[in-house]
């Protein structure tokens, strides 16, 4: 974390770069707690996921609108994320998002409605895959196949507890494909 004084306010910047490469027959599940930006913070994350044929990958990333219990919803300066997924050398998925609450105004509809928590998950499986069909009624969840063997989940949740339920269901569906999956929790 890099801190710098801007005017009379403290400005905190955090950058995170992640790069994962899976060789053929490798099996990895990556999931972490949600990023929770605090007031005046700036967060920039870049993730690259590379897999060879025959590998299996589960990837989960989540965000909150801020430290809600501290009244800091949508008070961060910047939340920026880029996720790239490559199968072999082919770019199969690219997602970029940039949220600047101060620039976008309080009435911006991208505030995700009543949902202060959101997540994306990717699942790359060499075999057929069946995602869960029922999710918490308190959430909004969509699952799509975006490329051969690559599945995307997007979800909106009212709180961290509901998000964990969705994450648990998603991870269970991955483990059904291969019970020998290795997991990393950040």
State each model region's role.
Residues 4, 51-53, 137:
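Short, structurally constrained coil/turn elements
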Residues 5-6, 42, 116:
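Generic structural microfeature
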């Amino acid at each position: 974390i890099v801190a710098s004084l801007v005017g009379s306010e403290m400005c905190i910047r955090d950058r995170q770069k992640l790069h994962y490469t899976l060789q053929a027959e490798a099996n990895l599940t990556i999931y972490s707690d949600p990023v929770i930006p605090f007031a005046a913070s700036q967060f920039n994350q870049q993730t690259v996921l590379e897999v060879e044929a025959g590998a299996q990958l589960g990837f989960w990333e989540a965000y909150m609108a801020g430290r809600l219990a501290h009244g800091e919803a949508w008070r961060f300066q910047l939340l920026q994320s880029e996720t790239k997924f490559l199968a072999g050398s082919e770019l199969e998925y690219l997602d970029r998002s940039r949220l600047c609450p101060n620039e976008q105004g309080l009435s911006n509809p991208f505030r995700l409605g009543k949902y202060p928590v959101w997540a994306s998950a990717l699942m790359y499986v060499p075999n057929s895959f069946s995602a869960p069909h029922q999710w918490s009624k308190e959430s909004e969840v969509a699952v799509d196949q975006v490329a051969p063997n690559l599945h995307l989940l997007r979800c909106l949740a009212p709180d961290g507890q509901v998000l964990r339920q969705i994450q648990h269901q998603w991870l269970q569906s991955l483990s059904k494909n291969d019970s020998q999956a290795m997991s990393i929790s950040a």
